[in-house]
């Protein structure tokens, strides 16, 4: 069968509301009784074990859909919009982190998310589930060479800010009110040297406790919403 799977109640509901065609929808009898909107979608009922086998996980909440393949956006078109707000991920391999970043980015009204083609998570059923369906509404683009992409799109209308724990400039002092690309590295590794050098400014998130860093999805949420605050202020 063609297409991709989406599972989980929120992820499937957003798929039904989003841009992708839903080819097939399966649910358990219990899920149909618990979730009123499923009845309107006219799903096929299947035993829970069948859905677990189909999804490859038991974390489906009794709802699985087959949808058309995810259509990635053009990274250069995203950078070219007026006053873009981009979340750029460098070597973030955990699908749960990508999903969480996408959820925060969509909630903050970001223009889109950029990920490298190699060594990074891309949109999968697990990412859609972790994003609570945000990937269905948020443009996501894949680039071959992340450092080169940043060098090509940055300029007076788009500043590139890299999140780095050792940066002297804090997020409170950074000017995030214009067109910005916020770049985040993997939690343990940080930004790669070439990507770090492609940033116009490195910014840190002030920490008041004893931990040395935050999860990448938390850091992304903080900076995205600080950018939103400055834009709306």
Regions found by a protein language model. Name each.
Residues 13, 18-19, 107, 129-134, ...:
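Structured adenosyl-cofactor binding patch, chiefly the S-adenosyl-L-methionine
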Residues 30-31, 48-50, 118-120, 166, ...:
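Short, ordered loop/turn segments at secondary-structure junctions
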Residues 58-68, 131-135, 177-185:
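Short basic, glycine-rich beta-strand/loop surfaces that mediate nucleic-acid
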Residues 27, 81-169, 173:
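RNA substrate-binding interface of SAM-dependent RNA methyltransferases
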Residues 8, 90, 97, 213-215:
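Active-site helix-initiating loop/hinge in glycosyltransferases
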Residues 161-211, 215:
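Active-site/ligand-binding-proximal alpha/beta "capping" segment
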Residues 1-80:
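N-terminal positively charged helical leader segments and presequences
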């Amino acid at each position: 069968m063609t297409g991709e799977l989406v599972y989980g109640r929120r992820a499937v509901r957003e798929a039904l509301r989003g841009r992708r065609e839903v080819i097939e929808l399966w649910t358990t009898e219990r899920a149909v009784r618990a979730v009123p909107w499923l009845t309107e979608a006219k799903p096929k009922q299947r035993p829970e074990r069948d859905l677990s086998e189909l999804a490859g996980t038991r974390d489906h909440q009794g709802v699985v859909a087959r949808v058309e393949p995810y259509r990635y956006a053009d990274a250069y078109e995203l950078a070219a919009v007026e006053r873009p707000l981009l979340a750029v991920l460098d070597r973030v391999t955990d699908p749960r982190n990508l999903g969480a970043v996408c959820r925060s980015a969509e909630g903050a009204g970001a223009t889109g998310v950029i990920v490298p083609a190699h060594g990074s998570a891309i949109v999968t059923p697990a990412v859609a589930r972790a994003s609570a369906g945000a990937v269905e509404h948020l443009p996501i683009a894949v680039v071959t060479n992340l450092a080169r992409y940043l060098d090509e799109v940055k300029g007076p209308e788009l500043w590139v800010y890299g999140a780095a724990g050792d940066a002297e400039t804090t997020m409170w002092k950074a000017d995030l009110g214009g067109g910005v690309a916020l770049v985040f590295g993997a939690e343990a590794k940080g930004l790669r040297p070439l990507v770090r050098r492609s940033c116009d400014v490195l910014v840190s998130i002030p920490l008041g406790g004893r931990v040395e860093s935050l999860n990448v999805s938390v850091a992304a949420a903080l900076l995205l919403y600080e950018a939103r605050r400055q834009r709306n202020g």
